[in-house]
């Protein structure tokens, strides 16, 4: 009987703590407050006083912050305060205008990146393969042209989209590897890093232009993804093994590009493809007249490809003659 009464008493005391929704530590804290010594009860108040004093010190420091730091602090607390971040870092996007006074709307290139294409270049030039490496490069490109022609046939815009996604790879790979070599060997590059990166950027602008002419379908995007992934890695390895062969290969690849754009122009002149107005991005990039057409755009792009052809054959010739690229000035700005 006595044990039953003791159990009931224990349950009455522990029940609220074991089965209440309120956490146990809050109940224990409430019980502890009743037996807390006077000195201990003062401690929370002292801590609160210290926190308050610290807050006052921080507020005073914030008031004394230099103006840029205060601006950054305001930007951190206000995500929409974009101008404060720009002002703090000292970077202000320039407001550019064209020659006619209208606002420059392109972010990927600036007025000083534009140029007038030299369309007088000979688009019929061809490098006769000499020796096994040249013949291997030539016939590799020719073998790739067969499935390309069967797949695209006369769909020139689709072909151009795929071509430009691949054509922008060699310049980037070559420029990157020459850049790393320059850093690794503590030597100059002869300007070839910049020349090859200019080529890659120019090819990318061709792609941006054709995206204004047509949008790729899902299967074309998948094809581009596969082709670019394979070609980048293959060209990377090829350039490491033999830069001479790699540049010769690209020279022949650019010859095929010139030939493809020549066929494009023939169909435009024959009326098989509508000669639509030129995209605005092409007019600004190549400084074309306001009434330029698609034919004018294809003409300047073909001229660009011919210049890339010459540059890569020239780079291969330099190395074929036993010289190094860094010892021969690169044709920077060769358009």
Curated annotation (Swiss-Prot):
Covalent S-S links between cysteines: none
Superkingdom assignment: Eukaryota
GO biological process: alternative respiration
Gene Ontology MF: a single term: superoxide-generating NADPH oxidase activity
Binding positions for Fe cation 2 per the UniProt entry: 203, 254, 305, 308
Catalytic activity: 2 a ubiquinol + O2 = 2 a ubiquinone + 2 H2O
Designated name of the protein: Ubiquinol oxidase 1b, mitochondrial
Species annotation: Oryza sativa subsp. japonica
């Amino acid at each position: 009987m006595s044990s039953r009464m003791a159990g009931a008493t224990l349950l009455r005391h522990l029940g609220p703590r074991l089965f209440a929704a309120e956490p146990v530590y809050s109940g224990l804290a409430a019980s502890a407050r009743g037996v807390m010594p006077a000195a201990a009860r003062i401690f929370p108040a002292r801590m609160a006083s210290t926190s308050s004093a610290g807050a006052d010190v921080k507020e005073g420091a914030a008031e004394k912050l230099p103006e840029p730091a205060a601006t950054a602090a305001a930007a951190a607390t206000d995500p929409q305060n974009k101008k404060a971040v720009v002002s703090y870092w000292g970077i202000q996007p320039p407001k550019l205008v064209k020659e006619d006074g209208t606002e420059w709307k392109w972010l990927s290139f600036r007025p000083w990146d534009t140029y007038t294409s030299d369309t007088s270049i000979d688009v019929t030039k061809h490098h006769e393969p000499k020796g096994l490496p040249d013949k291997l490069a030539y016939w590799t490109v020719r073998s790739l042209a067969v499935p390309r022609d069967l797949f695209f046939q006369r769909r020139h815009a689709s072909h151009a989209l795929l071509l430009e996604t691949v054509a922008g790879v060699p310049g980037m790979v070559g420029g990157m590897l020459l850049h790393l070599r320059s850093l690794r060997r503590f030597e100059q590059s002869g300007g070839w890093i910049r020349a090859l990166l200019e080529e890659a950027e120019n090819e990318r602008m061709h792609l941006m232009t054709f995206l204004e002419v047509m949008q790729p379908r899902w299967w074309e995007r998948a094809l581009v993804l596969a082709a670019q992934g394979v070609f980048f890695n293959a060209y990377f390895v090829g350039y490491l093994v033999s830069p001479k062969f790699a540049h010769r290969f690209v020279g022949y690849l650019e010859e095929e590009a010139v030939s493809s754009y020549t066929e494009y122009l023939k169909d435009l002149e024959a009326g098989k493809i509508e000669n639509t107005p030129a995209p605005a991005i092409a007019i600004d990039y190549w400084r074309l007249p306001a009434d330029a057409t698609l034919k004018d755009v294809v003409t300047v792009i073909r001229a660009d490809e011919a210049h890339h052809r010459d540059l890569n054959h020239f780079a291969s010739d330099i190395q074929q003659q036993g010289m190094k690229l860094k010892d021969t000035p690169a044709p920077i700005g060769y358009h």
